[in-house]
Amino acid sequence: MSTRGNDPVALCADAVARWHASWLTALGIPWTRDADAWRALAPPHVIYFAAITLRPETPVEAVVGSPGSICDNWQSFDLAPAGYAIFRQEPWFYRPPGPAPGAAPPELELVRVSTEDEVEEFEEVSVRGFENEDAVIEAGTMHPAGVLDDPAMAIFLGRIDGKAVGAAMGYRTEAAVGVFGVTTVASARRRGYATALTRAAMLPETGLPAVLAPSEEGKSLYEKLGFEAVGALTIWTKTST
Protein backbone atom coordinates (compact mmCIF):
# COMPACT_ATOMS: atom_id res chain seq x y z
CA MET A 1 0.00 0.00 0.00
CA SER A 2 1.44 3.35 -1.02
CA THR A 3 0.61 6.28 1.23
CA ARG A 4 3.54 8.47 0.20
CA GLY A 5 5.39 7.67 3.39
CA ASN A 6 2.48 8.55 5.67
CA ASP A 7 0.52 6.52 8.19
CA PRO A 8 -2.75 5.89 6.31
CA VAL A 9 -4.78 6.89 9.35
CA ALA A 10 -2.86 10.17 9.43
CA LEU A 11 -4.12 10.79 5.89
CA CYS A 12 -7.65 10.11 7.12
CA ALA A 13 -7.26 12.40 10.13
CA ASP A 14 -5.88 15.24 8.03
CA ALA A 15 -8.67 14.90 5.46
CA VAL A 16 -11.48 14.92 8.02
CA ALA A 17 -9.91 17.89 9.82
CA ARG A 18 -9.56 19.90 6.62
CA TRP A 19 -13.11 19.02 5.54
CA HIS A 20 -14.39 20.24 8.90
CA ALA A 21 -12.32 23.40 8.68
CA SER A 22 -13.81 24.17 5.28
CA TRP A 23 -17.41 23.82 6.40
CA LEU A 24 -16.92 25.64 9.70
CA THR A 25 -15.24 28.50 7.86
CA ALA A 26 -18.28 28.72 5.58
CA LEU A 27 -20.54 28.66 8.64
CA GLY A 28 -18.55 31.43 10.33
CA ILE A 29 -17.49 29.21 13.24
CA PRO A 30 -13.90 29.77 14.41
CA TRP A 31 -11.50 26.88 14.73
CA THR A 32 -7.86 26.19 15.45
CA ARG A 33 -5.34 23.51 14.58
CA ASP A 34 -1.96 22.44 15.89
CA ALA A 35 0.15 19.29 15.66
CA ASP A 36 -2.07 17.43 18.12
CA ALA A 37 -5.61 18.30 17.15
CA TRP A 38 -8.11 20.31 15.17
CA ARG A 39 -10.69 22.05 17.38
CA ALA A 40 -13.82 24.14 16.93
CA LEU A 41 -13.80 27.24 19.13
CA ALA A 42 -17.60 27.47 19.31
CA PRO A 43 -20.28 24.78 19.18
CA PRO A 44 -20.77 23.51 15.61
CA HIS A 45 -23.89 21.89 14.19
CA VAL A 46 -24.36 18.40 15.61
CA ILE A 47 -23.23 16.74 12.35
CA TYR A 48 -19.72 18.14 12.88
CA PHE A 49 -17.06 17.15 15.36
CA ALA A 50 -15.75 19.73 17.79
CA ALA A 51 -12.31 18.11 18.10
CA ILE A 52 -10.30 15.75 15.91
CA THR A 53 -7.05 14.05 16.91
CA LEU A 54 -4.20 14.37 14.42
CA ARG A 55 -1.72 11.86 15.82
CA PRO A 56 -1.90 8.80 18.08
CA GLU A 57 0.14 10.57 20.77
CA THR A 58 -2.30 13.48 21.11
CA PRO A 59 -2.77 14.20 24.83
CA VAL A 60 -6.28 14.00 26.27
CA GLU A 61 -6.00 17.63 27.35
CA ALA A 62 -5.86 18.71 23.72
CA VAL A 63 -9.46 17.66 23.09
CA VAL A 64 -11.35 17.33 26.38
CA GLY A 65 -13.61 20.30 26.97
CA SER A 66 -14.20 20.96 23.28
CA PRO A 67 -17.71 22.28 22.53
CA GLY A 68 -19.13 19.07 21.06
CA SER A 69 -18.18 15.55 20.01
CA ILE A 70 -14.60 14.29 19.77
CA CYS A 71 -13.19 12.16 16.94
CA ASP A 72 -10.41 9.93 18.27
CA ASN A 73 -8.85 8.77 15.02
CA TRP A 74 -6.55 6.13 16.52
CA GLN A 75 -8.83 5.02 19.35
CA SER A 76 -6.14 6.16 21.76
CA PHE A 77 -8.35 7.44 24.58
CA ASP A 78 -10.64 6.30 27.33
CA LEU A 79 -12.62 9.47 27.90
CA ALA A 80 -15.17 7.93 30.26
CA PRO A 81 -13.36 9.28 33.36
CA ALA A 82 -13.67 12.76 31.83
CA GLY A 83 -17.44 12.40 31.49
CA TYR A 84 -17.71 11.16 27.91
CA ALA A 85 -19.41 8.13 26.38
CA ILE A 86 -18.79 6.30 23.12
CA PHE A 87 -21.34 7.42 20.54
CA ARG A 88 -20.10 5.31 17.64
CA GLN A 89 -17.04 3.52 16.26
CA GLU A 90 -16.23 3.32 12.56
CA PRO A 91 -13.39 1.85 10.49
CA TRP A 92 -11.08 3.98 8.41
CA PHE A 93 -10.92 2.83 4.79
CA TYR A 94 -8.14 3.54 2.29
CA ARG A 95 -7.99 3.03 -1.48
CA PRO A 96 -4.85 3.46 -3.60
CA PRO A 97 -4.88 5.93 -6.50
CA GLY A 98 -6.58 5.05 -9.75
CA PRO A 99 -9.99 4.93 -11.39
CA ALA A 100 -12.67 2.54 -10.16
CA PRO A 101 -14.15 0.09 -12.67
CA GLY A 102 -17.72 0.47 -13.80
CA ALA A 103 -19.94 3.21 -15.16
CA ALA A 104 -22.77 5.28 -13.74
CA PRO A 105 -26.30 4.07 -14.47
CA PRO A 106 -27.41 5.77 -17.70
CA GLU A 107 -30.40 7.44 -16.08
CA LEU A 108 -28.26 9.10 -13.39
CA GLU A 109 -27.12 12.67 -14.04
CA LEU A 110 -23.95 13.47 -12.09
CA VAL A 111 -23.53 17.18 -11.37
CA ARG A 112 -20.51 18.85 -9.81
CA VAL A 113 -21.96 21.64 -7.69
CA SER A 114 -20.89 25.14 -8.69
CA THR A 115 -23.75 27.52 -7.77
CA GLU A 116 -25.54 28.64 -4.62
CA ASP A 117 -28.77 27.01 -5.80
CA GLU A 118 -26.97 23.72 -6.30
CA VAL A 119 -25.47 23.89 -2.79
CA GLU A 120 -29.00 24.35 -1.44
CA GLU A 121 -30.17 21.38 -3.52
CA PHE A 122 -27.25 19.35 -2.16
CA GLU A 123 -28.12 20.24 1.43
CA GLU A 124 -31.76 19.32 0.91
CA VAL A 125 -31.05 15.90 -0.60
CA SER A 126 -28.41 15.17 2.06
CA VAL A 127 -31.00 15.68 4.79
CA ARG A 128 -33.53 13.54 2.93
CA GLY A 129 -30.93 10.84 2.42
CA PHE A 130 -29.56 10.69 5.96
CA GLU A 131 -32.89 11.26 7.72
CA ASN A 132 -36.04 10.59 5.69
CA GLU A 133 -37.56 11.77 2.44
CA ASP A 134 -39.92 14.16 4.20
CA ALA A 135 -37.15 15.91 6.14
CA VAL A 136 -36.62 19.61 5.47
CA ILE A 137 -33.98 22.12 6.53
CA GLU A 138 -33.47 25.84 6.34
CA ALA A 139 -30.92 26.61 3.63
CA GLY A 140 -27.40 27.08 4.96
CA THR A 141 -28.03 25.46 8.34
CA MET A 142 -25.41 22.75 7.78
CA HIS A 143 -23.98 23.42 4.34
CA PRO A 144 -23.82 27.11 3.38
CA ALA A 145 -22.95 28.23 -0.12
CA GLY A 146 -19.83 30.01 1.12
CA VAL A 147 -18.03 26.68 0.85
CA LEU A 148 -17.81 27.32 -2.89
CA ASP A 149 -14.90 29.62 -2.05
CA ASP A 150 -12.79 26.56 -1.18
CA PRO A 151 -11.45 24.95 -4.39
CA ALA A 152 -10.48 21.81 -2.47
CA MET A 153 -14.14 20.98 -1.82
CA ALA A 154 -15.87 18.99 -4.57
CA ILE A 155 -19.61 18.45 -4.10
CA PHE A 156 -21.64 16.13 -6.30
CA LEU A 157 -25.35 15.69 -6.89
CA GLY A 158 -27.05 12.72 -8.47
CA ARG A 159 -30.30 13.52 -10.27
CA ILE A 160 -32.98 11.38 -11.85
CA ASP A 161 -35.37 13.18 -14.21
CA GLY A 162 -34.08 16.48 -12.89
CA LYS A 163 -34.66 15.68 -9.20
CA ALA A 164 -31.81 15.16 -6.75
CA VAL A 165 -31.74 11.66 -5.27
CA GLY A 166 -28.19 11.49 -3.91
CA ALA A 167 -25.06 13.39 -2.96
CA ALA A 168 -21.39 12.99 -2.08
CA MET A 169 -18.34 15.12 -1.33
CA GLY A 170 -14.65 14.79 -2.05
CA TYR A 171 -12.11 16.94 -0.21
CA ARG A 172 -8.63 17.15 -1.72
CA THR A 173 -5.57 17.52 0.49
CA GLU A 174 -1.94 17.44 -0.58
CA ALA A 175 -1.80 13.68 -0.02
CA ALA A 176 -5.30 12.20 -0.31
CA VAL A 177 -8.95 12.75 -1.15
CA GLY A 178 -11.40 12.39 1.71
CA VAL A 179 -14.82 11.10 0.67
CA PHE A 180 -17.70 12.34 2.81
CA GLY A 181 -21.46 12.46 2.97
CA VAL A 182 -22.32 9.75 0.44
CA THR A 183 -26.08 9.24 0.52
CA THR A 184 -29.12 8.42 -1.55
CA VAL A 185 -32.78 8.83 -0.63
CA ALA A 186 -34.48 5.62 0.46
CA SER A 187 -36.62 5.26 -2.66
CA ALA A 188 -33.54 5.41 -4.93
CA ARG A 189 -31.27 2.91 -3.17
CA ARG A 190 -29.77 -0.33 -4.53
CA ARG A 191 -29.57 1.02 -8.06
CA GLY A 192 -25.86 1.86 -8.20
CA TYR A 193 -26.29 5.57 -7.56
CA ALA A 194 -24.22 5.71 -4.36
CA THR A 195 -21.44 3.79 -6.10
CA ALA A 196 -21.42 6.27 -8.97
CA LEU A 197 -21.40 9.23 -6.59
CA THR A 198 -18.52 7.68 -4.64
CA ARG A 199 -16.50 7.18 -7.82
CA ALA A 200 -16.94 10.85 -8.64
CA ALA A 201 -16.11 12.01 -5.11
CA MET A 202 -12.88 9.98 -5.10
CA LEU A 203 -11.55 12.51 -7.65
CA PRO A 204 -9.52 9.79 -9.40
CA GLU A 205 -8.18 12.36 -11.86
CA THR A 206 -6.02 13.78 -9.03
CA GLY A 207 -3.89 10.63 -8.87
CA LEU A 208 -4.33 10.61 -5.08
CA PRO A 209 -5.50 7.81 -2.79
CA ALA A 210 -9.00 8.08 -1.32
CA VAL A 211 -10.02 7.67 2.33
CA LEU A 212 -13.35 7.46 4.12
CA ALA A 213 -15.12 6.19 7.23
CA PRO A 214 -18.00 3.96 6.14
CA SER A 215 -21.23 3.20 7.90
CA GLU A 216 -21.94 -0.45 8.59
CA GLU A 217 -24.41 -0.44 5.71
CA GLY A 218 -21.91 1.08 3.30
CA LYS A 219 -18.90 -1.16 3.93
CA SER A 220 -19.57 -3.65 1.15
CA LEU A 221 -20.11 -0.89 -1.41
CA TYR A 222 -16.70 0.61 -0.67
CA GLU A 223 -14.95 -2.74 -0.51
CA LYS A 224 -16.21 -3.47 -4.03
CA LEU A 225 -14.58 -0.20 -5.12
CA GLY A 226 -11.22 -1.34 -3.74
CA PHE A 227 -11.21 0.25 -0.28
CA GLU A 228 -9.74 -1.66 2.65
CA ALA A 229 -9.68 -1.07 6.39
CA VAL A 230 -6.53 0.55 7.77
CA GLY A 231 -7.69 1.59 11.24
CA ALA A 232 -10.68 2.72 13.23
CA LEU A 233 -12.02 5.81 14.98
CA THR A 234 -14.15 6.40 18.05
CA ILE A 235 -16.63 9.25 18.41
CA TRP A 236 -17.01 10.46 21.99
CA THR A 237 -19.85 12.65 23.26
CA LYS A 238 -20.26 14.37 26.61
CA THR A 239 -22.65 12.58 28.94
CA SER A 240 -25.49 14.48 30.59
CA THR A 241 -24.81 15.85 34.03
Label the model's feature ranges.
Residues 1-67, 76, 149-150:
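N-terminal charged segments
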Residues 45, 125-136:
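Helix-loop element at the rim of GNAT/NAT acetyltransferase active sites that forms part
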Residues 53-117, 212, 233-238:
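Acyl-donor-binding surface of acyltransferase catalytic domains
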Residues 60-63, 180-204, 224:
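Conserved acetyl-CoA-binding loop-helix of GNAT-fold acetyltransferases
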Residues 79, 222, 227:
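Conserved active-site tyrosine of GNAT-family acetyltransferases
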Residues 88, 164-166, 231:
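A structural microfeature
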Residues 116-128:
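A short, well-structured alpha-helix characteristic of acyl/acetyltransferase catalytic modules
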Residues 135-185:
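A conserved beta-strand-loop-helix scaffold within acyl/acetyltransferase catalytic domains
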